[in-house]
Regions:
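Catalytic core of soluble alpha/beta enzymes
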Residues: 1-105, 110-112
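Flexible C-terminal active-site loop/helix
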Residues: 105-188
């Protein structure tokens, strides 16, 4: 989709034909091409109807800046695209009044911890998207033994009370994960 009028038409029809559903719609996510630099589409008319979130386009805070200039009103943060990148984008977006969400591309095992910690402190529109337990339910069993509430959803929520201390609160000493032997050893 490259025409804001197309997205606006869908939203306008939804608002007139099904106003209850339109009211429940929290946001629109990345309906336009991912490469913002090549596709500099003015989307202010869409974000005037519903919050418009960058997702795949938001892999660098400078692209988030460009997106905001084009009319995007929110950004999806993903620690799987680097923790530092997510933090830089978070800071820039917050400083410029953009809405935030934290999503994953399936963060199992230890990756789940910084992911949910970012969401807990970011001020998102509604919690965190975390789907590793859905797609890879057994991948995080060693971590789940130490952080049970983090790897099991209850009533749509995860629980972070076991995360504390240094190193993102991993508690690595208690996690019994067997790793394969290293491929390369330096200085052995």
């Amino acid at each position: 989709v490259t025409a804001p009028s197309y997205v606006n038409g869908i939203l306008d029809q939804l608002r007139s034909r099904h106003p209850d559903i339109y009211q429940m719609l929290l946001y629109v996510e990345q309906p336009f091409p991912y490469d913002l630099e090549k596709n500099q589409i003015d989307v202010h008319s869409v974000s005037a109807r519903k919050p418009l979130f960058m997702d795949e386009s938001a892999h660098d805070w400078r692209l988030v800046r460009l997106g905001r200039q084009l009319g995007w009103s929110g950004v999806a943060l993903k620690t799987c695209k680097t923790q530092t990148g997510a933090l830089l984008t978070l800071c820039w977006a917050k400083a410029h009044g953009m809405d935030l969400m934290v999503q994953d591309l399936t963060n199992p095992m230890l990756a789940q911890i910084p992911h949910v910690l970012l969401a807990a402190h970011a001020g998102t529109i509604m919690g965190v998207e975390t789907n590793a337990m859905q797609f890879y339910p057994d991948a995080s069993l060693p971590e789940q033994d130490v952080h049970p509430g983090l790897y099991r959803r209850r009533d749509g929520s995860v629980e972070l009370s076991t995360i504390s201390g240094p190193g993102f609160g991993y508690h690595l000493g208690g996690i019994r994960r067997e790793l394969p032997p290293p491929v390369v050893s330096v200085g052995a």
